[in-house]
């Protein structure tokens, strides 16, 4: 059997996944089963859009449950205490300055399971994170983005 992919995450990220899994199993799954029962009571399933919709929801919920269980089972916890605080690594927050315009941005590098660009959490697999990992304060880094190359300077790591 092929080795399953490891999912790097913080304790906070793992907790969020566990909470979502708990909700899906204890609440959402039951809601969908009830919708299926109600839709079945309408009779003929061949032209029953409520039934079809509920079955689609069930497939989505069960798929997400399986996905979350796998991610949690293969979680590798990021422990910042064991990492040099002066080096960009998983779990670290990095403040950057785009060059030459001077615009500042801040990102936390997390595992792909908990990445959320809208919250400033970028996946360790992203081009930005790949360019930053292992670098230190004052390093200048060229990042390949979909919009072209971008140069940044690392201002702070925490």
UniProtKB/Swiss-Prot annotation:
Role description: Necessary for efficient RNA polymerase transcription elongation past template-encoded arresting sites. The arresting sites in DNA have the property of trapping a certain fraction of elongating RNA polymerases that pass through, resulting in locked ternary complexes. Cleavage of the nascent transcript by cleavage factors such as GreA or GreB allows the resumption of elongation from the new 3'terminus. GreA releases sequences of 2 to 3 nucleotides.
Source species taxonomy: Bacteria, Bacillati, Bacillota, Bacilli, Bacillales
Coiled coil (UniProt feature): 48-75
GO MF entries: DNA binding; RNA polymerase binding
InterPro entries per the UniProt record, alphabetical: GreA/GreB_C_sf, TF_GreA/GreB_CS, Tscrpt_elong_fac_GreA, Tscrpt_elong_fac_GreA/B, Tscrpt_elong_fac_GreA/B_C, Tscrpt_elong_fac_GreA/B_fam, Tscrpt_elong_fac_GreA/B_N, Tscrpt_elong_fac_GreA/B_N_sf
Superkingdom, taxonomy of origin: Bacteria
UniProt name for this protein: Transcription elongation factor GreA
UniProt keyword DNA-binding present: yes
GO-annotated biological processes: DNA-templated transcription elongation; regulation of DNA-templated transcription elongation
Gene: greA
UniProt key word DNA-binding: yes
Family: Belongs to the GreA/GreB family.
Pfam family, one: GreA_GreB_N
């Amino acid at each position: 059997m092929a080795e399953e992919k490891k999912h790097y995450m913080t304790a906070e990220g793992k907790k969020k996944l566990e909470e979502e899994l708990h909700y899906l199993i204890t609440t959402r799954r039951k809601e969908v089963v009830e919708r299926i029962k109600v839709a079945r009571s309408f009779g003929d399933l061949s032209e029953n859009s409520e039934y079809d919709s509920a079955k689609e929801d069930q497939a989505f919920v069960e798929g997400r449950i399986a996905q979350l269980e796998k991610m949690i089972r293969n979680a590798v916890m990021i422990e910042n205490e064991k990492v040099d605080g002066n080096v960009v690594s998983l779990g670290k927050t990095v403040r950057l300055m785009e060059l030459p315009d001077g615009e500042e941005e801040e990102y936390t590098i997390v595992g792909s399971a908990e990445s959320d660009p809208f919250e400033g959490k970028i996946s360790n697999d992203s081009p930005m994170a790949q360019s930053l990992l292992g670098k230190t304060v004052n390093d200048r880094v060229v990042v390949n983005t979909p919009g072209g190359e971008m140069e940044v300077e690392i201002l702070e790591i925490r």
